[in-house]
């Protein structure tokens, strides 16, 4: 049987360098990679591509193949690769000032002021290193503030890999309980027993079930934790009125509403998805786009909740938190993102891609459609609407998506091989990039339509 890599070689791609590096890496790194999203079991079979370099909207692998890059590091490369303003700010800071001091700098407050000015729901903000940390702090803070224990989280969402939330990301439906009463399914072994007792798992986009759950359990619920746009089961938009209902229900019962904007923050607009959609959460977490390619995250929100951090009731600590490199990168990134017209131009290129892909698929009579908001989108090979994780499991054709990915890769267009990831667009992408992408898409769609 022909493997995916055989198909790439036949299409004129040489990836033997990646094959050799992967074999060597497997001898010293478990699975040959340092993140599950790059692993063979995440779709990179029989091995992931090994990168030589990136520049702007392009990425080059070790075998010299060049791609229009819509993977973008899974989201943080909002400006594309090696953006001059961010890179220069980091190099300048290292050369002139240092890296880690274990003491504050004036740059931290300047960054906090920019975040607060950009995101209306944030009165105060604390920095950290990763989205996982930011979510951990937000849920801990919500529990401390409300003096309650339970967290509502939604099937199909990813909020980092801490024990308290690494549940029901993509569970087997047979193990996940009935549609209207899901059970918590651990992402894998090693989770302490009893953690799931403080989790309430719900399907997304079901306002009535959320209302019924809060009516029944409200006095025990500390927080509702959600992405404002579902980004870890492909791209799924909130149904009209759903987030508004969530906000009203949580506010009425004194439940902290936490928006995980690790992916959407500073990507869907300077104020994130919450500003774009007009919803004001109590706490928010940010990462990815905040650093313009450098590792930095933040958690912020209402002043009365954040006061528990100010007085030491809830501890947030870390040697590398607010290190000079991360803060310099984030300050430069937010300055660049504040450029007048930047998001309008980014949305225009993104809309051209999204609408163009939809037209290509429609003209090929493929059972597929494109869902997205601004520079975030995914192709669903499905005939039924997908509103939550279980819809995706039941209706999305993963095999056709795989063939779509292979065909696009062979034609120099890169995105993640998993249908539950997304295509990301950067400010470096051009109308010419979109035209080349759509030309490749027409060829692949025609091949898929013939059943090849």
Residue ranges and their predicted role:
Residues 2-452:
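Conserved N-terminal phosphate-binding loop of PLP-dependent enzymes in the Aspartate aminotransferase
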């Amino acid at each position: 049987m022909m493997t995916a890599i055989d198909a790439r070689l036949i299409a004129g791609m040489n990836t033997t360098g990646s094959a050799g590096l992967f074999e060597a890496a497997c001898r010293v790194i478990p699975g040959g990679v340092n993140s599950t999203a790059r692993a063979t079991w995440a779709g990179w079979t029989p091995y992931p591509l090994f990168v030589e370099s990136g520049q702007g909207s392009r990425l080059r692998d070790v075998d010299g193949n060049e791609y229009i890059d819509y993977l973008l590091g899974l989201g943080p490369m909002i400006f594309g690769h090696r953006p001059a303003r961010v890179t220069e700010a980091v190099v300048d800071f290292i050369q002139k000032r240092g890296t880690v001091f274990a003491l504050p700098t004036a740059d931290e407050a300047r960054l906090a002021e920019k975040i607060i000015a950009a995101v209306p729901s944030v009165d105060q903000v604390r920095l950290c290193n990763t989205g996982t940390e930011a979510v951990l702090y937000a849920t801990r803070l919500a529990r401390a503030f409300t003096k309650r224990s339970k967290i509502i989280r939604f099937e199909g969402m990813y909020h980092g890999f801490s024990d308290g939330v690494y549940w029901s990301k993509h569970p087997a439906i047979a193990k996940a309980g009935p549609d209207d009463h899901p059970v918590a399914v651990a992402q894998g072994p090693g989770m302490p027993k009893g953690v799931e007792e403080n989790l309430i798992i719900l399907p997304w986009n079901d306002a009535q079930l959320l209302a019924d759950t809060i009516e029944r359990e409200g006095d025990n619920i500390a927080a509702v934790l959600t992405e404002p746009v579902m980004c870890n089961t492909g791209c799924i938009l909130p149904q009209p009125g759903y987030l508004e209902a969530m906000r009203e229900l949580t506010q009425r019962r004194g439940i902290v509403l936490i928006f995980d904007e690790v992916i959407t923050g500073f990507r869907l607009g300077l104020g994130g998805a919450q500003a774009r959609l007009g919803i004001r959460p109590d706490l928010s977490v940010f990462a990815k786009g905040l650093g313009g390619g450098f590792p930095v995250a933040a958690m912020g929100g209402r002043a009365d909740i954040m006061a528990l951090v100010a007085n030491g009731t809830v501890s947030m600590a870390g040697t590398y938190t607010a290190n000079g490199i991360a803060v310099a990168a984030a300050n430069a990134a937010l300055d660049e993102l504040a450029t007048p017209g930047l998001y309008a131009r980014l949305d225009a290129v993104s809309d051209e891609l999204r609408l163009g892909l939809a037209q290509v698929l429609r003209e090929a009579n493929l059972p597929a459609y494109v869902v997205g908001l601004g520079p975030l989108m995914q192709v669903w090979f499905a005939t039924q609407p997908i509103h939550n994780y279980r819809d995706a499991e039941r209706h999305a054709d993963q095999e056709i998506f795989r063939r779509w990915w292979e065909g696009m890769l062979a034609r120099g267009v890169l995105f993640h091989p998993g249908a539950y990831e997304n295509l990301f667009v950067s400010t470096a992408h051009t109308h010419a990039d979109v035209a080349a992408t759509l030309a490749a898409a027409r060829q692949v769609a025609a091949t898929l339509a013939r059943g090849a």
